């Protein structure tokens, strides 16, 4: 039997990733084990994906049951799990219509295409400007990576889609300066993830809503990372009490099973008439059965309330550790999406702490070169939390 090790990755895989040296082979809850049987506490959740932990019993049961019924039938047909999930999302959010895809990038691609199509249908081709924010991240398709405000990801692929304008995040005056009647949409993350876990201010998001209303533009919330309970609310827009026209969701929606969704209103959805946009696998029964169970669990008020309590404990513990090590300039975030910015002396070295944490049996993330990112399972146990912080303190002890 072939023993697959990290060196084989370099021999057979395209090198657009540089994975860790250890290979996880099994996970349960917030524990992960590698090929050698070493135990890790997972403070990453697969980048805010496995929000119910690894191999959650309820999710495994649903997946097993659906796997014996129907896997795929294409969008020439619909399915019961697809309709059940769409119904749940409509019941629990502002949305009246849902489209399913396979990832966050696809959800954002669909949202941007819908915004442009809606503008063409109602105002003409000249209304095509998209306003986005510097250091944002919306996916890796040519359209979404161009809308994301990071040249390191978007440069080098030839001409980019036109009529995309980037302005500073949390700067309403900058948006006002470029907003006009040719703007079809503003797309924003309620919390910028890849740039360092930067929450939007209440006034900023409320101001975007008002500007969009004034200029007949659509407001798109990219909740790929903040959605499905991550902030302590089912979706972050509920915390801010600012309702978007289009919302995108993915990551935690499938708890590790690939699925994405675009949510919008009935009126806006009319612009996606039959054949205008599509997907082969979007809304497949396996993914939707899993996601419906995820929504059932996470949307329960006691579950969401516990996330907020766990968030308070997590932030408090980070502050206590920082009082001892003094490595963090700022600790910020919402719910269980938390960033700890390193002091200037350690700028550019966040990835070093990630590697050291792994050596100590802890999985953490970066959010840019200066920020450690924490996104544990929303239902992480007290035992796993305590053990994880013990290993984090060891990691940060200089």
Swiss-Prot record:
N(2)-acetyl-L-ornithine binds at residues 140, 279. Its EC number is 2.6.1.11. GO terms for molecular function: identical protein binding; N2-acetyl-L-ornithine:2-oxoglutarate 5-aminotransferase activity; pyridoxal phosphate binding. Signal peptide: none annotated. The modification N6-(pyridoxal phosphate)lysine is found at residue 251. It catalyses: N(2)-acetyl-L-ornithine + 2-oxoglutarate = N-acetyl-L-glutamate 5-semialdehyde + L-glutamate. Binds 1 pyridoxal phosphate per subunit. Keywords: Amino-acid biosynthesis, Aminotransferase, Arginine biosynthesis, Cytoplasm, Pyridoxal phosphate, Transferase. GO terms for biological process: L-arginine biosynthetic process. InterPro entries: Ac/SucOrn_transaminase_bac, AcOrn/SuccOrn_fam, Aminotrans_3, Aminotrans_3_PPA_site, Class-III_PLP-dep_AT, PyrdxlP-dep_Trfase, PyrdxlP-dep_Trfase_major, PyrdxlP-dep_Trfase_small. One of its GO terms (cellular component) is cytoplasm. It holds the Pfam family Aminotran_3. Pyridoxal 5'-phosphate binds at residues 104-105, 137, 222-225, 280. Its cofactor is pyridoxal 5'-phosphate. SUPFAM superfamilies: PLP-dependent transferases. Pathway: Amino-acid biosynthesis; L-arginine biosynthesis; N(2)-acetyl-L-ornithine from L-glutamate: step 4/4. Homodimer. Belongs to the class-III pyridoxal-phosphate-dependent aminotransferase family. ArgD subfamily. May also have succinyldiaminopimelate aminotransferase activity, thus carrying out the corresponding step in lysine biosynthesis. This is Acetylornithine aminotransferase.
């Amino acid at each position: 039997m072939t023993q697959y090790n990290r060196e084989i990755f370099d021999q057979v895989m395209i090198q657009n990733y540089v994975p860790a040296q250890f290979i996880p082979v099994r996970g349960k809850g917030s524990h992960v084990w590698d090929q050698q049987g070493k135990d890790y506490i997972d403070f990453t959740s697969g980048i805010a994906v496995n929000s119910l932990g690894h191999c959650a019993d309820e999710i495994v049961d649903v997946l097993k049951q659906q796997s014996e019924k129907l896997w795929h039938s294409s969008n020439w047909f619909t399915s019961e799990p697809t309709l059940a999930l769409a119904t749940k999302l409509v019941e629990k959010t502002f949305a009246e219509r849902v489209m399913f895809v396979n990832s966050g990038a696809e959800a954002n691609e669909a949202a941007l295409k819908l915004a442009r199509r809606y503008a063409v249908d109602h105002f003409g081709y000249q209304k095509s400007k998209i306003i986005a924010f510097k250091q944002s991240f919306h996916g890796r398709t040519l359209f979404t990576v161009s809308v994301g405000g990071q040249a390191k990801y978007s440069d080098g692929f030839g001409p980019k889609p036109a009529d995309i304008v980037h302005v500073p995040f949390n700067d309403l005056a900058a948006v006002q300066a470029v907003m006009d009647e040719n703007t079809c949409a503003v797309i924003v993350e309620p919390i910028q993830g890849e740039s360092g876990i930067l929450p939007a201010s209440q006034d900023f998001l409320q101001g975007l809503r008002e500007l969009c209303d004034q200029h007949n533009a659509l407001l798109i919330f990219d909740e790929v990372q903040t959605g499905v309970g991550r902030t302590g609310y089912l979706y972050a827009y509920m915390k801010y009490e600012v309702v978007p026209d289009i919302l995108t969701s993915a990551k935690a929606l499938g708890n590790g099973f690939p699925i994405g969704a675009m949510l919008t209103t009935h009126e806006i959805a009319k612009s996606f008439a039959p054949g205008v946009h599509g997907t082969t696998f979007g809304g497949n029964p396996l993914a939707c059965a899993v996601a419906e169970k995820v929504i059932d669990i996470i949307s329960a008020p006691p579950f969401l309330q516990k996330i907020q309590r766990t968030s308070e404990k997590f932030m408090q513990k980070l502050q206590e550790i920082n009082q001892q090590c003094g490595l963090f300039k700022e600790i910020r975030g919402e719910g269980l999406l938390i960033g700890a910015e390193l002091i200037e002396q350690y700028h550019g070295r966040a990835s070093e702490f990630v590697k050291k944490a792994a050596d100590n049996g802890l999985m953490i993330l970066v959010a840019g070169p200066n920020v450690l990112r924490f996104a544990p399972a929303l239902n992480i146990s007290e035992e796993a939390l305590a053990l994880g912080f013990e290993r984090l303190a060891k990691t940060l002890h200089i």
